[in-house]
Curated annotation (Swiss-Prot):
Belongs to the alanine racemase family. The keyword Isomerase applies. Gene3D superfamilies: Alanine racemase (3.20.20.10), Lyase, Ornithine Decarboxylase, Chain A, domain 1 (2.40.37.10). Pathway: Amino-acid biosynthesis; D-alanine biosynthesis; D-alanine from L-alanine: step 1/1. One of its GO terms (molecular function) is pyridoxal phosphate binding. This is Alanine racemase. SUPFAM superfamilies: Alanine racemase C-terminal domain-like, PLP-binding barrel. The gene is alr. InterPro entries: Ala_racemase, Ala_racemase/Decarboxylase_C, Ala_racemase_C, Ala_racemase_N, PLP-binding_barrel. It catalyses: L-alanine = D-alanine. The lineage of its organism: Bacteria, Pseudomonadati, Pseudomonadota, Gammaproteobacteria, Thiotrichales. It comes from Piscirickettsia salmonis.
Amino acid sequence: NSAAIFNFSYERYDWVRPGIMLYGISPFADKNGVDLELQPVMHVVSRLISVKQLRQGESVGYGATWQCPEDMQVGILSLGYGDGYPRLAASGTPFLVRGQRCALIGRVSMDMIAIDLRRCPDAGVGEAVTVWGQDLPVEEIARHVGTIAYELVCNMPLRAPYIWQE
């Protein structure tokens, strides 16, 4: 397996089964793939479908579990648990907008996620948002969700459009 490849010498063997490292993902709980000089093979991107200015105290998401600590801009992503994003991801789980970390706020719904855009006040509808990939390791998202990266990459359904590149 991938962990064994990193931890043991294989000069005397004819074959190995690399597993998760083929995705560019670390097999170790305390490391990301880039720490091991692996390149992620999956870059998941969504887009902002709405940007709203909310007032301090307004609630976001099902069950009103998150309230705006101040007047702020909130973005809505076209992404949810129906697209393979983990429903149990908590507020604070990171996304990247223009290279800036923006936190998930409220609950993940089937088709949408709300994010805090205070770090990217100029972000607008159509803006690309990195869910995970080169600059936001899937291992980090998995740690926020309390799962493993393998589960996240294997749960991406065909409902989400795939763009294959070499």
